[in-house]
A protein has these predicted regions:
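Accessory alpha/beta interaction modules
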Residues: 1-144, 154
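Short, charged alpha-helical interaction segments and adjacent helix-coil junctions
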Residues: 1-5, 9, 62, 66-71, ...
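Generic structural signal for hydrophobic core residues of well-folded globular domains
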Residues: 14, 28, 112, 151, ...
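Active-site cofactor/cluster-binding pocket
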Residues: 134, 151, 230
Length: 275
């Protein structure tokens, strides 16, 4: 049985494995990485901008002049947040040099594990595209931001990328009987790393604590959305009653009669009359 990769303990255990990280980055970005350091919960001191960010996994490869960030999306994150993360890493490079020459390429890879009704895509790549006046592209900035969503994998998904999307999806949806491409040695290794029985007692405890906390936050967000919908419906009902009141006012109907017909207060009807 697999442990779910939408849990940060399991997620970090998998993607901090050097072999897994190298294969995954190669399959998604095409880049070779040989990290000198692999950090978790990476932050920058002092913080860049007004937000003190934490990056799930941060790998630095000075040989290939490459930095790779990997982030798991929690329920409350959105695309703009990770654009900020991506730019923060670039800005950190600038802060660490005397001049503005960056010297390294930054790739940020974001895992979205929930369904996205707006962008139903398996892989979205965002890059800084520079175009000259004649229409020619100029490769000024190599940095890229990748969004992966296993819910929208298909036959058109590149096979190597699909293997990783299926691993994440199956660990969440079918952990007891996952359907994976175990013909690939690296996928077999990845599967072994996230076997539920292979978690240490400490990893298991932290994973359960985190899941409980995130479930609590998700319930709070759901409650907030429901309250927002109720407020929206109530506001819509009131606006409809106001429209009726305006029409009756235009016909010269008395305030008391309008109040009885719409349920609006006489004071509000008086404001509508003045407005």
């Amino acid at each position: 049985m697999l442990a779910p990769l939408d849990n940060s303990v399991v997620f970090k255990k998998l993607f901090t494995d050097r072999d897994v990280l190298q294969a995954f980055v190669k399959d998604v970005t095409g880049a070779t990485i040989d990290p000198a350091t692999i950090e978790t919960e990476k932050s920058f001191a002092p913080p860049i901008g007004a937000i003190d960010i934490k990056i799930d996994i941060f790998a630095d490869d000075p040989t290939h002049r490459l930095i790779v960030e990997i982030q798991r999306v929690r329920y409350d994150y959105h695309y703009d947040r990770f654009l900020y993360y991506h730019h923060a890493a670039i800005m950190e490079l600038q802060r660490s040099h005397t001049h503005y020459l960056l010297g390294k390429t930054v790739y940020t890879i974001v895992w979205l594990t929930g369904k996205d009704e707006t962008y139903k895509k398996d892989l979205i790549t965002t890059s800084l595209r520079s175009v000259a006046s004649d229409g020619a592209e100029v490769p000024l900035y190599p940095h890229k931001l990748f969004f992966l969503n296993p819910n929208y994998r298909s036959d058109r998904t590149p096979e190597a990328v699909r293997d990783w999307l299926e691993l994440v999806f199956e660990s969440i949806a079918h952990p007891e009987q996952p359907h994976l491409n175990t013909a690939r040695q690296i996928i077999r290794r990845a599967t072994g790393l996230i076997e539920s029985d292979g978690l240490t007692p400490t990893e298991r405890r932290i994973a359960m604590e985190e899941q409980g906390y995130e479930d609590h936050l998700a319930l709070r967000e759901q409650k907030g959305r429901e309250e927002g919908r109720l407020e929206g419906r109530e506001e819509g009902r009131l606006e409809s009653q106001r429209d009726i009141a305006r029409n009756l006012l235009a016909q010269g109907v008395a305030t008391a009669v309008i109040a009885a017909a719409t349920g609006l207060s006489e004071a509000e009807i008086a404001r509508l009359r003045e407005g």
